[in-house]
UniProtKB/Swiss-Prot annotation:
Pfam families: Ribosomal_S2. The gene is rpsB. Belongs to the universal ribosomal protein uS2 family. PROSITE patterns: RIBOSOMAL_S2_1 (PS00962). Keywords: Ribonucleoprotein, Ribosomal protein. This is Small ribosomal subunit protein uS2. One of its GO terms (biological process) is translation.
């Protein structure tokens, strides 16, 4: 049984690629045709890739692997946070800060700083400071929450990065590959499938398409973790 049906993908607009002049030739095997100057993705192949991605992700979760969802474009931001939270994964949905993976020691210290500031705010410690100092601390807290809030539960580097729009998240791709971290990537027709272990050819711009794909991957992670817990018990 398919993880995601052709009708679901059609309704979500998962088959719409980019303009033909913006394509990456390496995506040709996933393209069905071109209409009105736009590439149409072969959803039969997307369904096969999703079956593979679901199985791969489920097995990774069952094996105790840690996941990081990354998608910083506006239309993906809320979905990334929602689905990552639902399956207990870390996420980056605002801006990829250089060194988030390759300079993990420094990034981890910034996350601890965020936690400290949150404790200070909730305890009323910041409110007791002089007005100017309190304002500075709250601005720092707001900035750290915006960019690092989704990483608070990430104590170590992830084993798998799940990407929305591989082309946009170039720095995340480079850092993950440098550290041999596996990539599960939603790939539009302008992407390079050779850069990831688990490709999912689909429209990475439409909110419903992103919701559909990330939702299934989150399901796979939850299912894998549940299977792992059942085996332990």
């Amino acid at each position: 049984m398919a993880v995601v049906s052709l009708s679901e993908m059609m309704e979500a607009g998962a088959h719409f690629g980019h303009q033909t002049r913006r394509w990456n030739p390496k995506m040709s095997k996933y393209i069905y045709c071109a209409r009105n100057g736009v590439h149409i993705i072969d959803l039969v192949k997307t369904a096969l890739c999703m079956n593979n991605a679901y199985k791969w992700t489920r097995n990774a979760a069952k094996g105790g692997k840690r996941f990081l969802f990354v998608g910083t474009k506006k239309q993906a931001s809320d979905v990334v946070a929602q689905e990552a939270t639902r399956c207990g994964a870390a996420y980056v949905n605002q801006r990829w800060l250089g060194g988030m993976l390759t300079n993990w020691t420094t990034m981890k210290a910034r996350i601890e700083r965020l936690k400290d500031l949150e404790r200070m705010e909730s305890s009323g410690s910041i409110a007791m400071r002089p007005k100017k100092e309190a304002a500075v601390l709250r601005r720092e807290l707001e900035r750290l929450q915006k960019y690092l809030g989704g990483l608070k539960g990430m104590r170590r580097l992830p084993d798998v990065v799940v990407l929305v729009d591989q082309r946009r998240e170039t720095n995340a791709v480079l850092e993950a590959r440098k550290l041999d971290i596996s990539l599960v990537s939603m790939l539009d027709t302008n992407c390079d499938p050779d850069l990831c272990e688990v490709p999912i050819p689909c429209n990475d711009d439409a909110v419903r398409s992103v919701q559909l794909i990330l939702g299934r991957l989150a399901d796979a992670i939850n299912e894998g973790r549940k299977a792992s817990n059942n085996e332990k018990n």
